[in-house]
């Protein structure tokens, strides 16, 4: 007899499975239902065999299908032992059920492989899948593919929403209708990438869910259509040729693959479980000044101290010293890997600057790029063998950099010692951990592909630093948003969303990124105008409001601002501090899909609703549609009014008398009506933004 097992996440997804009979039958666990908890009551009836198919019934929607079970779709696990044992068929399934966890195990006695699949329920309504595959034979097994998880869709027309882009234009939303074949995404860049993020949503008439891979290296996502019209979403690590060879008794442990119902579920999971804060509590996210665009490599201690003093006057709370502080680092061609303080720029070391910053009540942060080395460096001159390379092949430079082989213990020890020394001798609160190139020719000392080992070694180094300095936060940066995922976020506390600080470009970047990442983790800075990446000239108001809801910061030299600009920026910093508790509170955020270039996002509580409206480079048309808010925002009910607006004189194209009264708070309205009728706001000029704050007009707690 087959056995029914299930796993439920609180207020989230439920997975109900049929385990194959424990009689030696070769099969994989069949998915009876996957979705909201009520789906677990689905009728559980064995299906007949296919027409003109195998005599035995072979389920279509199973976890991790393999060819050995008579499955003709895309196999989730495959490999061989010197050309033999190429068919995998698991049997004798067992299940261990505990609160929030379902561990399934099976063996293949012919291929001499064993499989353990662990499904876990996480806070926020997210479930995860992880696979452990072990070679029980007496000869090596070449593992070509092993997905971390498989998640089924309904048998109906579906659309996939994925995220593509490039450097400076990350998280561009892409929607495609799924056809009858395979939808495939592969990333071979050795880091998460700017163009193929390991996360997506699948949506049909009666189902929507998202998946995310907790891994920062090469990955593969496949959506395969089954014989019965359903689809399987597979995701896992992508191996280089010959990379994953399992010796006898050796196991492969996959990354975690996550599934959740919506953005709110993923946000809740990240906040409650994935990210770990110093002291186990997130403090208000400090307004940050990062020195890169204000100084580049031109470090002068006196000027940096003056910038810090001005930053403190403006209300900034964290001062991060970016690239250029270490010896001979006058441009990006030299000295990566050395990590010795430049005694020419800093004759007394970093301590005077660090002490000055902290004396002003600000935190001090420091930039590193630990994984990289310049050929022009003392480290490379001493240890050229320490870089990833393929014997007989030329070293491939990118941004004048080579990649250190972190799988060598001596390399990891060297980097830890350098970082540990600086953190131990200075009052440093955070690290900006950069990584500015893709990986090519990723060969280890044994001559074999080492991409998978390199990523795990990186996690090990980050974990080692976290354990040695538990009060220090880490920001993940990789040429901007090139390493933003649920793997690196286990060891970090913030991500640099993009190297592009142009507020107009940031609208779509932040819109896409915020679907999987809470806003307080996404670095968003006010930069100079004209912008250094695009040359666009944008108002300080627009730049500030676009960054307002995220981990707010500044990317410029404040000494170069006029006094009126400094005053205006200080007002926006004060506004962010007043609203950040609301903007970053769990379960309060919302975002609307952009229409005619108009982006809308914000946060809500029973006492206050903050709505940011930003108009892109195009005009809406004759007039904008009324602003409708989602039901989880209007659920507070009662009558509300606009209590405040920023700026006080918004850049409208035209405005009616009634709209003026509305913005002045003279008109109240039913909050519930905003779900259907909407709020008739005036038309903003292109490249301008408005923040409105709503408050209830009644004293009743339910605002009724």
List the model feature ranges, each with a label.
Residues 3-6, 13-21, 25-224, 240, ...:
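Polysaccharide-binding surfaces and accessory modules of carbohydrate-active proteins
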Residues 244-262, 686-694:
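Short Pro-Gly-centered flexible turn/kink motifs
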Residues 347-349, 381-541, 551-556, 560:
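Active-site neighborhood of glycoside hydrolase catalytic domains
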């Amino acid at each position: 007899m087959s056995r029914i097992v299930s796993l439920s996440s609180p207020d989230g997804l439920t997975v109900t499975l049929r385990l194959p009979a424990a009689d030696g039958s070769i099969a994989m666990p069949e998915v009876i239902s996957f979705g909201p908890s009520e789906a677990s009551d689905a009728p559980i009836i064995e299906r007949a065999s296919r027409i003109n198919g195998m005599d035995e019934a072979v389920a279509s929607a199973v976890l991790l299908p393999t060819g050995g079970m008579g499955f003709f779709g895309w196999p989730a696990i495959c490999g061989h032992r010197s050309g033999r044992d190429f068919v995998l068929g698991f049997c004798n399934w067992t299940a261990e059920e505990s609160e929030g966890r379902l561990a399934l195990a099976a063996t293949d006695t012919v291929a001499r492989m064993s499989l353990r699949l662990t499904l876990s329920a996480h806070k926020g309504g997210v479930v995860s899948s992880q696979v452990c595959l072990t070679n029980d034979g007496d000869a090596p097994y070449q593992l070509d593919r092993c997905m971390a998880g498989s998640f089924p869709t309904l048998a109906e027309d579906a659309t996939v929403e994925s995220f593509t882009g490039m450097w400076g234009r990350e998280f561009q939303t892409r929607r495609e209708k799924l056809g009858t074949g395979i939808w495939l995404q592969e990333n071979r860049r050795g880091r998460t990438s700017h163009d193929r993020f390991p996360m997506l949503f699948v949506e049909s008439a009666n189902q929507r869910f998202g998946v995310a891979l907790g891994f920062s290296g090469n990955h593969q996502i496949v959506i395969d259509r089954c014989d019965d019209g359903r689809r399987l979403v597979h995701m896992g690590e992508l191996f280089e040729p010959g990379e994953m060879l399992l010796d006898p008794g050796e196991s492969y442990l996959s990354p975690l693959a996550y599934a959740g119902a919506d953005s709110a579920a993923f946000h809740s999971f990240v906040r409650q479980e994935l990210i770990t804060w110093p002291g186990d509590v997130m403090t208000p996210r400090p307004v940050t000044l990062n020195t890169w665009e204000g100084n580049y490599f031109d470090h002068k201690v006196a000027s940096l101290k003056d910038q810090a003093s001005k930053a403190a006057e403006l209300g900034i709370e964290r001062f991060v010293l970016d690239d250029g502080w270490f010896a001979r680092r006058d441009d990006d061609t030299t000295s990566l890997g050395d990590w010795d303080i430049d005694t020419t720029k800093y004759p007394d070391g970093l301590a005077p600057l660090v002490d000055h910053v902290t004396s002003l009540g600000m935190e001090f942060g420091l930039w590193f790029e630990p994984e990289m080395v310049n050929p022009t460096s003392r480290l490379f001159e001493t240890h050229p063998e320490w870089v990833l390379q393929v014997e007989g092949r030329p070293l491939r430079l990118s941004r004048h950099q080579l990649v250190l082989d972190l799988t060598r213990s001596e390399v990891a020890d060297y980097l830890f010692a350098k970082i540990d020394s600086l953190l131990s001798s200075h009052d440093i609160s955070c690290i900006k951990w950069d990584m500015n190139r893709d990986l090519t020719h990723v060969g280890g000392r044994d001559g074999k592909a080492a991409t998978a080992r390199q990523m795990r070694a990186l996690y090990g180094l980050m974990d080692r630093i976290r354990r040695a300095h538990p009060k220090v936060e880490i920001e993940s940066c990789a040429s901007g948003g090139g390493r933003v995922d649920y793997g690196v976020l286990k060891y970090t506390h913030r991500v640099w969303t993009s190297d592009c600080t142009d507020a107009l470009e940031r609208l779509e970047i932040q819109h896409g990124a915020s679907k999987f990442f809470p806003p307080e983790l996404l670095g968003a800075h006010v930069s100079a105008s004209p912008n250094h990446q695009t040359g666009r000239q944008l108002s300080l108001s627009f730049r500030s409001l676009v960054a307002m809801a995220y981990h707010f910061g500044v990317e410029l030299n404040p000494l170069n601002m006029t006094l009126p600009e400094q005053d205006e920026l200080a007002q926006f910093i004060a506004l962010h501090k007043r609203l950040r508790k609301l903007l970053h509170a769990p379960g309060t955020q919302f975002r609307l899909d952009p229409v005619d270039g108009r982006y809308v996002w914000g946060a809500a509580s029973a006492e206050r609703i903050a709505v940011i409206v930003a108009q892109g480079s195009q005009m809406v048309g004759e007039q904008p549609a009324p602003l409708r808010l989602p039901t989880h925002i209007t659920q507070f009910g009662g009558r509300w009014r606009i209590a405040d607006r920023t700026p006080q004189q918004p850049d409208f194209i035209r405005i009616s008398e009634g709209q003026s009264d509305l913005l002045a708070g003279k008109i109240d309205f039913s909050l519930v009506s905003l779900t259907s009728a909407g709020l008739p706001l005036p038309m903003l000029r292109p490249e301008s933004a408005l923040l409105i704050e709503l408050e209830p007009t009644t004293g009743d707690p339910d605002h009724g």
